[in-house]
Design a protein with these regions (language model features):
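Acidic/histidine-rich, surface-exposed loop or edge segments in extracytoplasmic proteins
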Residues: 31-39
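Short, well-ordered amphipathic alpha-helical segments that serve as non-catalytic structural scaffolds
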Residues: 50-57
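Beta-alpha junction/loop-to-helix N-cap segments that form part of ligand/metal-binding clefts
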Residues: 27, 42-49, 61-108
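Bacterial N-terminal signal peptides that target proteins for export
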Residues: 1-8
Length: 108
């Protein structure tokens, strides 16, 4: 019974959120804030390239017409730089943000 209630609630939420989903022909920009320079550059760059390859593969196979673009922004593994990188991501039109390395930048 509890499962059925949760399933109905989830369906109602998804049905009412139709305007929040990307439409055909739209590009969804996702900012990847991670160190792309300095000590952790190799890790951050590798993760960025992985996300970009996944997005490119999805874009080729995606029948819905929605495209995904991963924008890499260097946060230098610094909380202060992360807030600047977040502003830059918003200026570039990113609607979603993800971050990989470091709890300090993640909390910023």
């Amino acid at each position: 019974m509890k499962f059925a209630i949760k399933a109905v609630a989830a369906s109602v939420i998804l049905a009412s959120a139709g305007g929040a989903f990307a439409q055909k022909g739209e590009t969804v920009k996702i900012a990847w804030l991670d160190p792309l320079s300095g000590l952790m550059a190799a890790v951050g760059t590798n993760q960025l390239k992985t996300y970009q390859l996944i997005a490119e593969d999805f874009n080729r196979k995606n029948a819905s017409g929605v495209k995904f673009e991963i924008i890499g922004i260097d946060n230098k593994l610094s909380p202060q730089e992360t807030t600047s990188a977040l502003r830059s991501a918003m200026d570039q039109g990113a609607r979603y943000v993800t971050q990989g390395n470091g709890s300090g930048p993640a909390l910023a």
